[in-house]
């Protein structure tokens, strides 16, 4: 079995690749706009994105990396940009993204709904595309090679245009790393 990991942050790259190793024999990592970590996957794809382009415009590159890898399962770090890329990939594959996966048991996954108040077990039919936080996997270790391939940028037919950006200070805790949340 082969797993395809799409992640932005270095922590998520390491955690999701380690977790993917527990459910698959081969792990492939794809990163848009930033160098992929080495030593965490069997192969890594650096999906190019020109300066000033929004990440969403790299969807064709992510799809090219997916097609090159031919994976059985896709694990996606649940960031806003990656969720869009996952949705676009799933649409091309004729399937849907299963969000907020917390556990894997063979082909059955457990995911949260109602804002995490309830859990649901389901089995994907067709291509498997899941958003999952790195904390869903216990103390797994990431292993791999330094093999990195660059996927050239392909401009979309109808590209998003970035009109401006504004720095927003980072505040609050990362709830995916908390053991207990009281609220």
Residue spans of the language-model regions?
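N-terminal glycine-rich FAD/FM-binding segment characteristic of electron-transfer flavoproteins
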Residues: 1-183
């Amino acid at each position: 079995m082969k797993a395809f990991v799409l992640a932005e942050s270095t922590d998520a790259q390491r955690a999701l690749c380690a977790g993917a190793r527990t459910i698959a024999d081969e792990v492939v990592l794809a990163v848009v706009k930033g160098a992929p970590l080495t030593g965490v996957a069997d192969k890594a794809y650096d999906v190019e994105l020109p300066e000033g382009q929004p990440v969403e415009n790299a969807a064709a590159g992510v799809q090219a990396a997916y097609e090159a890898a031919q994976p059985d399962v896709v694990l996606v770090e649940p960031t806003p940009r990656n969720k869009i890329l996952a949705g676009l990939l799933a649409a091309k594959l004729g399937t849907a993204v299963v969000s907020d996966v917390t556990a894997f048991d063979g082909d059955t996954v457990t995911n949260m709904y109602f804002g995490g108040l309830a859990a649901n077990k389901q089995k994907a039919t067709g291509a498997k595309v899941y958003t999952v936080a790195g904390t869903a996997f216990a103390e797994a270790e990431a292993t791999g090679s330094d093999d990195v391939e660059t996927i050239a940028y392909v401009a979309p037919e109808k590209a998003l245009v970035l009109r401006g950006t504004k720095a927003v200070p980072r505040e609050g805790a990362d709830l995916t790393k908390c053991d207990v949340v009281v609220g």
